[in-house]
Amino acid sequence: MTVPTTRKDLMIVNMGPQHPSMHGVLRLVVTLDGEDVIDCEPILGYLHRGMEKIAENRTIIQYLPYVTRWDYLATMFTEAITVNGPEQLGNIQVPKRASYIRVIMLELSRIASHLLWLGPFMADIGAQTPFFYIFRERELIYDLFESATGMRMMHNYFRIGGVAADLPYGWIDKCLDFCDYFLTGVTEYQKLITRNPIFLERVEGVGIIGGEEAINWGLSGPMLRASGIQWDLRKVDHYECYDEFDWEVQWQKEGDSLARYLVRISEMTESIKILQQALEGIPGGPYENLEVRRFDRAKDSEWNDFDYRFISKKPSPTFELSKQELYVRVEAPKGELGIFLVGDKSVFPWRWKIRPPGFINLQILPQLVKRMKLADIMTILGSIDIIMGEVDR
């Protein structure tokens, strides 16, 4: 009778790019000693589409439909950053109503993104039921998006100087009803999940990041705020009209997967607070800055030849980016989404560098999973919240 020998050498396992609980097409090459993770190497690039290069031969308006394909679960933020850059370059004022509409759309999008983080995260840990609950609420948000923008996802709604269309009749009441309903939904999630002993066993003390470490790795968003750093670009940069609302930055000091879960859950309730204030205080007026449509290069333009620049419905196709560079950023659900924009007196950007939050937050993964168990990889990766569309661009 032969005695089976115990393997002493290390085992290398490929997780992904088509692993059932892998988020998109990420591939992890994991070195294991039994159940213990010795090393982990993320391999990216399976969803690379050359988004930065595409931007260099498109006008801003032509490029707007492309940007919704970076983080395709929080598309309003990619649109916001795409129009904020040219607005700051051209010093374009956004009407108050348009700014309020933008805030409403951004916060709805933040809730939708956090919901679609929560469901798969719970499924990764082994709780299948919340996965179906979150679609119930998310569907309501998409209904609101559809009635306002015409699209459930990939809205293509923001424009330079405002938004594409005003809110339809009755939309604000419908959205307020959703806010009231959703608060009960979040309470239900907290009752169901937060004190669940099995859930706590899986996430408490797993993947701890200290405050200084988080800053050194360049983390942002819930990853940074869960490590005790109170940093939210909505408070720091004062963009749109967030200063007019009463809300708090949500943060935790533990820095583990549970803290990141708690930050995102409480961010959803803060978003509802902002939404309710914005919906109740939304001013009248135009939803778009009409001046943008008349960006004329020649000041003494003769009116005898037909020039469609002056009568176009949308911001003029000949909108020029002045010869300067600019970094703009917004607080996306996953972290700081930024764009480094270089103009050179042409309608196309000379350089359009994307700073995706998911890509930078993902860099800390190998360090977090070392000396953990194999099953913890999914917990830690889930708590980081990545979307491969923006990681690979």
UniProtKB/Swiss-Prot annotation:
One MF term in the entry's GO annotations: oxidoreductase activity, acting on NAD(P)H, quinone or similar compound as acceptor
Where the protein is mainly located, per its record? plastid
List the catalysed reactions.
a plastoquinone + NADH + (n+1) H(+)(in) = a plastoquinol + NAD(+) + n H(+)(out); a plastoquinone + NADPH + (n+1) H(+)(in) = a plastoquinol + NADP(+) + n H(+)(out)
Which keywords appear in this protein's UniProt record, sorted alphabetically?
A: Chloroplast, Membrane, NAD, NADP, Plastid, Plastoquinone, Quinone, Thylakoid, Translocase, Transport
Reported EC number(s) for this entry are: 7.1.1.-
Domain of life of the source: Eukaryota
Q: What are the GO cellular component annotations?
A: chloroplast thylakoid membrane
Q: Tell me which Gene3D superfamilies the record gives.
A: Cytochrome-c3 Hydrogenase, chain B
Topology relative to the membrane: Peripheral membrane protein
What are the subcellular locations of this protein?
Answer: Plastid, Chloroplast thylakoid membrane
InterPro entries for the chain:
NADH_Q_OxRdtase_suD, NADH_UbQ_OxRdtase_49kDa_CS, NDH1_su_D/H, NiFe-Hase_large
User: Could you provide one GO biological process annotation from this protein's UniProt record?
Assistant: photosynthesis, light reaction
Per the record, the similarity remark reads:
Belongs to the complex I 49 kDa subunit family.
Q: PANTHER family annotated for this entry?
A: NADH DEHYDROGENASE [UBIQUINONE] IRON-SULFUR PROTEIN 2, MITOCHONDRIAL, NADH-UBIQUINONE OXIDOREDUCTASE 49 KDA SUBUNIT
Quaternary arrangement and interactors, per the entry?
NDH is composed of at least 16 different subunits, 5 of which are encoded in the nucleus.
What is the role of the protein in this entry?
A: NDH shuttles electrons from NAD(P)H:plastoquinone, via FMN and iron-sulfur (Fe-S) centers, to quinones in the photosynthetic chain and possibly in a chloroplast respiratory chain. The immediate electron acceptor for the enzyme in this species is believed to be plastoquinone. Couples the redox reaction to proton translocation, and thus conserves the redox energy in a proton gradient.
Its name, as the record gives it, is: NAD(P)H-quinone oxidoreductase subunit H, chloroplastic
Write down the species: Ranunculus macranthus
Its taxonomic placement starts with: Eukaryota, Viridiplantae, Streptophyta, Embryophyta, Tracheophyta
Its encoding gene is what? ndhH
